[in-house]
């Protein structure tokens, strides 16, 4: 997947926070955090909650890496 949450994990390390801290601060479920750990999509609402809890923007949480290769049926 081209989108990932690497910037979020860096933010957490810099702030000395754990994933469980973000779950509590943002009111997330453990399933949401598990999805993020697998670089799976989350809802905009959950993204907004994380941004508010960490006082940041989506750019501080998500990065785009253009290494996605699309399968083409030949």
Could you describe each region identified by the protein language model?
Residues 2, 10-11, 62-74:
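Short, charged recognition helix plus adjacent turn
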Residues 28-42:
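Recognition helix of helix-turn-helix/homeodomain-like DNA-binding domains
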Residues 13, 27, 38, 66:
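Residue-level detection of the helix-turn-helix DNA-binding "recognition helix"
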Residues 21, 32, 60:
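Residues in the helix-turn-helix
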Residues 39-52:
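Short, basic-rich loop-to-helix N-cap that marks the start of a DNA-contacting helix
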Residues 6-25:
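Short basic helix-loop element that most often maps to the first helix and adjoining turn
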């Amino acid at each position: 997947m081209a989108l990932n949450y690497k910037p979020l994990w860096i933010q957490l390390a810099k702030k000395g926070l754990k994933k469980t801290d973000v779950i509590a601060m943002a009111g997330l479920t453990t399933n949401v955090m598990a999805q993020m750990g697998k670089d799976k999509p989350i809802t905009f609402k959950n993204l907004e909650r994380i941004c508010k809890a960490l006082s940041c923007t989506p750019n501080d949480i998500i990065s785009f890496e253009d290494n996605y290769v699309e399968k083409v049926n030949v």
